[in-house]
Amino acid sequence: MKRLFSKSLCTSAAGANLKPPPADSAAIAKLILSSPNTTHQDDQFLLSTKTTPWTPNLVNSVLKRLWNHGPKALQFFHFLDNHHREYVHDASSFDLAIDIAARLHLHPTVWSLIHRMRSLRIGPSPKTFAIVAERYASAGKPDKAVKLFLNMHEHGCFQDLASFNTILDVLCKSKRVEKAYELFRALRGRFSVDTVTYNVILNGWCLIKRTPKALEVLKEMVERGINPNLTTYNTMLKGFFRAGQIRHAWEFFLEMKKRDCEIDVVTYTTVVHGFGVAGEIKRARNVFDEMIREGVLPSVATYNAMIQVLCKKDNVENAVVMFEEMVRRGYEPNVTTYNVLIRGLFHAGEFSRGEELMQRMENEGCEPNFQTYNMMIRYYSECSEVEKALGLFEKMGSGDCLPNLDTYNILISGMFVRKRSEDMVVAGKLLLEMVERGFIPRKFTFNRVLNGLLLTGNQAFAKEILRLQSKSGSRLLRKFRL
């Protein structure tokens, strides 16, 4: 485990011989993540990036790569302000930083960034408020999200139909549909609501499986002279399947065809996936074949739905056949396609075939993502293939897909499968590296690693972990440095 506890990518203590990294977001992100939270490393990073030609595109790319490393991303954002004063962040970079801060529940930071945008006369925009509202709603604070929308004008940003539709969508997607419907009824007279508005509300009711309410919205829509579109009908169809109302879904699909609705690939994919989830594989395949007969070309999403259905029903061999059929017909599998099939192969115990498929994936230029790595690491760990799990972890660290919080948690849990002393030491090192990179371990994780070290005779290392826990406190978001 060469990478664990790597204190720096730099070999010179003074940093005099450092060469600036290329203007490449992957290299910069790795440099940031390799740097412990010390003043000395601030200086090292400054020297390393002194001649980097910063642009909004480069900064945004780095922020996106650090998305799962929120504290480090914010350090980087503020670092440019403090040490590269010739560069000024644009609105898109502020929006990304605000989203990261809001996701970490750092609300004072969020509002500090918003006020800064105003002082620079680059915002905030409706998109900025949509970002913050979404984070409020997902954190269980829908009233704050609504208040934010109603008070947008106080920050120089005025409400319009688009922002109204956005706040409704934010509330609905966070399952606060009652609150969204209440706002819709209160303000629909103020805005000239359209098909998009009704589709948002209808989708909200479908998301929480209240299809009778969704049908009421559809009926009201027609009565008010607002024409439903194909998105409306596809949303309703998906809602029936989501609610497990297979018969209603099929009848609705037949009614769509009877009324000469322009059935598209999304419609067919919805039906294929819906039948598959319900375990009706034969009907799913029949609909898939029907769409081809009707001249509606399947999409990659359609094939993904069929492959997922077959894998979930322990028909992984048929899923492989479907995958090869997809490739033979000229479709290019995406990361979801590969992830679904790799998961199916691993679930069936076909580890070597899953590994071969991952290699094929990379050879075809499709980069594995967090889901790919984390899923494979989990399966390896559960089957005591700890060395293979650690090998994938090292591969993540040397590539563009850097380990995230889930990766560390999965791997630390995996170290407890064999209950070996050396595995407990690795778990401790992972925990230390995790904290060093700005992640926030749960108290349970600290205690589990402590107990594991103590029970396997690693008392000295356990004391080091205990000191770290005491120093860190319940949250590790006190003061971060790059």
UniProtKB/Swiss-Prot annotation:
PROSITE patterns for the chain: PPR (PS51375)
PPR repeat placement: 90-124, 125-159, 160-190, 194-228, 229-263, 264-298, 299-333, 334-368, 369-403, 404-441, 442-476
Keywords: Mitochondrion, Repeat, Transit peptide
Pfam families: PPR, PPR_1, PPR_2
Highest taxon of source: Eukaryota
Biological process (GO), any one: RNA splicing
GO cellular component, one term: mitochondrion
Main location per the UniProt record: mitochondrion
Gene3D superfamilies noted in UniProt: Tetratricopeptide repeat domain
Compartment list: Mitochondrion
Similarity-based family: Belongs to the PPR family. P subfamily.
Function: Required for the trans-splicing of intron 1 of the mitochondrial nad1 transcript encoding the ND1 subunit of the mitochondrial membrane respiratory chain NADH dehydrogenase (Complex I).
PANTHER family in alphabetical order: OS03G0856100 PROTEIN (PTHR47447), PENTACOTRIPEPTIDE-REPEAT REGION OF PRORP DOMAIN-CONTAINING PROTEIN (PTHR47447:SF28)
Name of the molecule in the record: Pentatricopeptide repeat-containing protein At1g74900, mitochondrial
Species: Arabidopsis thaliana
